[in-house]
Amino acid sequence: MKLPRLSIFSLLLIQGWLLVQAEVAESQSISTDPAILDQLEIFDNFGDVFEQSFDEQGYPGQPWYYQLKETVIRFDRRPEGITALIDYLVRIRVTTDDPIRIAEASLVGIPYYFPENMERVINLEGYTYQPGGERTYFSGDDAAVVDLNSRYKILEFQMPDVKEGSVIEYKYTLVRRYIEELPDVQFSHRVPVREVNLYMKNEPYLRYQTVEENIDFELDYSEVRVDTSSIPMVFTYQRPDPVFIQRWGARDIPPVESSAYVSSIDDVRGKLKFQISEFGNPRQPLENSWEFVAAQIQRNINPFRMLRENNELAELGSSLYSTLGLSEARIDSLFQYVNSRARFNNTGSVFTDSGLDHVLEGEPADQAEINMVLLALLRGAGFEAYPLYISGREFGRINLSFPSLYQFNRMLLVAR
């Protein structure tokens, strides 16, 4: 029996359309397998440590090592704005009976940026597993908050019942309100790392530029677009964009040599940095440059605007030690004037948006507040003086390929 001519034509049309769709999907690495999205649910593996976790070969001479580090970056659009949700799953295996090294392996510190509630840690849980099958649960309730500096706090905790042969596992989610940059994802540490996996689930309205830093090991990269739509592939129907997933992975990452750095391990630690590069619907490219960083400072936290709001300090500087003129002796005298009256609270800082009246009254003040007072006195006395923003030795070198306000952690002054 012959098919009607219209049906044959329709079949040929459909067949040709399917071939075109297959070629398009292949060229764009589009997958229709939703199982790929299951890889992002790293918390589903929490609490399920297999026997091979205890049987695998360790690293000779190393007291402990990271068996697994997995990170998933995703985004949530909320009424108050877009939030980054970053899931972390970490497994550590202890291979020593040295109590000091065991304490080192079991002590965990999670840094987070606390001003303006920019970051917070949720979903913190953990287990300590023993080769015999026993496990001890850590609820996260015993974690302590420790002040690191004016911008960062550390959520610190000790995993329980850790001994030689134990496997430590913990998970948490970092909720971040500032999406222009994301926290660095660290690949290398003071001990070896067996396996690292990083996934980023992108949203249609934003993309990130990735900057590699100290990646001297093999780092695999792949990307896939997953079609999750149930809408038929007909050109007259509007279909949502496929889910764009990026993945980075590495295995057997060597430890960072302690002798390889002088001030900060971050100078030599292998990591990825993320900075927003496109935003909107449709997406538009965004400017990332040091000129833009300078414009941000002038627009949002202009130190000279604060000086204008504290004109009495300039008047004070004009009157102090005026007989010394514009000499180095006067600069030194103004420095000693501030130094003898200010009370440093041991907090290094870059910018300040609070008042300055308390500094010369001997109330506790941070580095930026004290230096802003000295800057006002110097400029009031007629000196050419400017703030100098730096990264302190303990904070690590500035990466010139990654323009960011958050690479600075201290403020100094230049005067002449």
Give names to the regions the model predicted.
Residues T95, T173, S318-S322, N339-R343, ...:
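Sec-exported extracytoplasmic/periplasmic mature domains
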Residues L12, I86, R120-I122, R194, ...:
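Alpha-helical structural motif
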Residues M1-S31:
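Bacterial Sec-dependent N-terminal signal peptides
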Residues E291-G362:
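Secondary-structure boundary elements
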Residues P160, L326, R330, V359-I370, ...:
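Secondary-structure capping and boundary motifs in well-ordered enzyme cores
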Residues E80-G81, E116, R283, L307-N310, ...:
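Generic detection of long, well-ordered alpha-helical segments
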